[in-house]
């Protein structure tokens, strides 16, 4: 078959395969055009989940009558005029491909009017044939009607899913849009019935979060807002125990554009690494703002992928911001009070809410902490830097279990919550009143009951102390008597050569000895017995894919977590009331104390109102 120029209609239909995948794609492109036109209200009307009709009405600037035919021409746009405009584009659309692609696979009607015009105009197109532009009564703004989507491409129409499924995709996209544009009023109707309505409002208000993402998300949200290096990251992440089995509540926006980015997703997941249960995923709504010239949005016709000029900086910025917010969480602290400031910046950390002054009447701080410190002294000590092989012996003394202490079966109630104490005087986790089956601590707080898994809580406290101790020591290296030869792919050898300084900071002294071979002369001392070959390969893989790695830190943390687990107080160990109270105070002062090292929750709160409902009180 000879080479020939394809007809315009076929070109547009081929392009539609990338831009118009389903009705939700059409809704996305048309509503983004409305937002770029300055609309503050958008109405979406659907029939048969968009398969029969998609009608988008907006109150934007509108178009002049003579511009309607231009709007549906390929690569015709009002948003860019030069390469400089493209490199700094801030609008949601700019390619001039969406409308021609939609026109080529539907029966299309375009109506518009500017506020300055006496009347509007309408243009109808079917099968790629443009009708005439004729005057038409219309309010200021634009209306687009897309009927019989894929009517002329039967193969594409057969791939559409059930009506409920297609509507679900549109509703999910509307949710994402409402999160990104809280000043936009959005109405979604299906088959003549109002399905969703998002009113303009403050994005950070509880009502807005509850309306879009539900009460559970809103009540577990930790606010994020950090700026630095010309970047700003703000939004919400949720506490680790509100994890998900999938990634359905992960929303990322770059300069207001909903995108998917593996590097940012990887950074967030790493920040949650030691507080998230295995196989679970964090939920978040994050907005990344930066100079448009530092991000390339012209990667894919659907504009759902971006490419950062400095991906390593972005990864590190997101990781540190999210990790810093999680580190501020303390057991008993209300979620929305956390991270409301400039997380990670100077003076950003809010005052710790659990800083409470104890008096002798409330249990005697010196006596309580002294008793608890004596019984758990091993975890108060700095951990030595040892190899994995030497760890059990070195830490045997450090974690030697103190002799079992037995207390009265019924604890004395006056050691619990003082009756005269006001709500403002009670620490977040309250005061211990009893121990349940040698496993759980029961504590009375200002508004109900706190239940603490004492082993899980003590495990996290010990883990954080060990991490701080080793952070103070720094990462020590262990030279090898005989250099180790490691055979790798040539690409990995290139990475090792380019990232020699990074590897040295991680404890690896590596030189290239051939196209696909490396000489390893030193390794991290703490991880000498932890399969350094596999660890180094993983580090090189991360550096190649993400430009960043935490493999060494994660391997170290895994070892420290194991040590902390072995050193934590065991089930059936009887604690005195004073020891339990001291453990509660330590939880309030320890980062990430809401989860153990494996991501399990360490405590739960039952409000008095909730307990009253169990017994039908007040009815």
Curated annotation (Swiss-Prot):
Gene3D superfamilies cross-referenced by the UniProt entry: 3.30.230.10, Histidine kinase-like ATPase, C-terminal domain, MutL, C-terminal domain, dimerisation subdomain, MutL, C-terminal domain, regulatory subdomain
Keyword DNA repair among record annotations: yes
Gene Ontology terms describing biological process: mismatch repair
A GO molecular function held by the record: ATP hydrolysis activity
GO cellular component: mismatch repair complex
Superkingdom per UniProt: Bacteria
Pfam family, one: MutL_C
InterPro entries: DNA_mismatch_repair_CS, DNA_mismatch_repair_MutL, DNA_mismatch_S5_2-like, HATPase_C_sf, MutL/Mlh/PMS, MutL/Mlh/Pms-like, MutL_C, MutL_C_dimsub
Key words of the record: DNA damage, DNA repair
Function: This protein is involved in the repair of mismatches in DNA. It is required for dam-dependent methyl-directed DNA mismatch repair. May act as a 'molecular matchmaker', a protein that promotes the formation of a stable complex between two or more DNA-binding proteins in an ATP-dependent manner without itself being part of a final effector complex.
Sequence similarity: Belongs to the DNA mismatch repair MutL/HexB family.
PANTHER family: DNA MISMATCH REPAIR PROTEIN MLH, PMS, MUTL, DNA MISMATCH REPAIR PROTEIN MLH1
NCBIfam families: mutl, PRK00095.1-2
Name of this protein: DNA mismatch repair protein MutL
Source lineage: Bacteria, Pseudomonadati, Pseudomonadota, Gammaproteobacteria, Lysobacterales
């Amino acid at each position: 078959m000879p080479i020939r120029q394809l007809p315009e209609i076929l070109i547009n239909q081929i392009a539609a395969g990338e831009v118009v995948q389903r009705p939700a794609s059409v809704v996305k492109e048309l509503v983004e055009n409305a937002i770029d036109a300055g609309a503050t209200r958008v109405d979406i009307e659907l029939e048969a989940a968009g398969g029969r009709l998609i009608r988008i009405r907006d109150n934007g600037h509108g178009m002049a009558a003579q511009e309607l035919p231009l709007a549906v021409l390929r690569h015709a746009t009002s948003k860019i005029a030069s390469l400089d405009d493209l490199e700094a584009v801030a609008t949601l659309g700019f390619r001039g491909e969406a409308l021609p692609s939609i026109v080529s696979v539907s029966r299309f009607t375009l109506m518009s009017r500017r506020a300055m015009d006496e009347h509007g105009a309408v243009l109808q197109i079917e099968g790629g044939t443009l009708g005439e532009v004729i005057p038409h009564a219309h309010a200021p703004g634009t209306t687009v009607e897309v009927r019989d989507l894929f009517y002329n491409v039967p193969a594409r129409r057969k791939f559409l899913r059930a009506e409920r499924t297609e509507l679900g995709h549109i509703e999910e996209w509307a949710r994402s849009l409402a999160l990104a544009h809280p000043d936009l009023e959005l109405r979604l109707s299906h088959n003549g019935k109002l399905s969703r309505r998002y009113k303009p409002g403050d994005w950070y208000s509880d009502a807005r979060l509850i309306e879009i993402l539900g009460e559970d998300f809103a009540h577990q949200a930790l606010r994020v807002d950090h700026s630095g290096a010309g970047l700003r990251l703000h939004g919400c992440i949720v506490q680790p125990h509100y994890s998900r089995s999938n990634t359905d509540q992960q929303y990322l926006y770059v300069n207001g554009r909903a995108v998917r980015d593996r590097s940012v997703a990887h950074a967030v997941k790493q920040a949650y690494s030691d507080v998230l249960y295995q196989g679970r995923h964090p939920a978040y709504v994050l907005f990344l703002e930066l100079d448009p010239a530092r991000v390339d949005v012209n990667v894919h016709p659907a504009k759902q992928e971006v490419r950062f000029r400095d991906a390593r900086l972005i990864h590190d910025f997101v990781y540190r911001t999210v990790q810093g917010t999680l580190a501020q969480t303390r057991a008993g602290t209300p979620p929305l009070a956390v991270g409301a400031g400039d997380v990670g910046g100077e003076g950003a950390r809010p005052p710790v809410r659990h800083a409470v002054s104890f008096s002798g009447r409330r249990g005697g701080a010196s006596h309580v902490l002294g008793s608890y410190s004596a019984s758990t002294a091993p975890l108060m000590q700095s951990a030595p830097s040892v190899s994995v092989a030497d760890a059990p012996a070195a830490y045997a003394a450090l974690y030697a279990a103190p002799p079992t202490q037995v207390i009265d079966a019924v604890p004395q109630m006056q050691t619990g919550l003082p009756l005269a104490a006001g709500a403002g005087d009670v620490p977040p986790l309250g005061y211990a009143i009893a121990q349940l089956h040698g496993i759980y601590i029961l504590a009375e707080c200002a508004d109900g009951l706190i239940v603490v898994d004492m082993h899980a809580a003590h495990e996290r406290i010990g883990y954080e102390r060990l991490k701080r101790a080793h952070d103070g020591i720094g990462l020590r290296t262990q030279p090898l008597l005989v250099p180790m030869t490691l055979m790798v792919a040539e690409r990995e050898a290139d990475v090792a050569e380019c990232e020699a300084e990074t590897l040295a900071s991680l404890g690896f002294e590596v030189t290239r000895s051939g196209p696909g071979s490396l000489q390893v002369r030193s390794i991290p001392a703490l991880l000498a017995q932890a399969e350094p070959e596999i660890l180094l390969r993983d580090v090189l893989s991360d550096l190649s894919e993400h430009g960043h790695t935490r493999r060494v830190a994660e391997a170290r943390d895994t070892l420290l977590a194991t040590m902390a687990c072995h050193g934590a107080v065991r089930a059936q160990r009887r604690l005195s009331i004073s020891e339990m109270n001291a453990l509660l105070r330590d939880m309030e002062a320890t980062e990430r104390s809401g989860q153990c090292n494996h991501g399990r929750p360490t405590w739960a709160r039952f409000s008095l109102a909730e307990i009253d409902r169990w017994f039908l009180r007040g009815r």
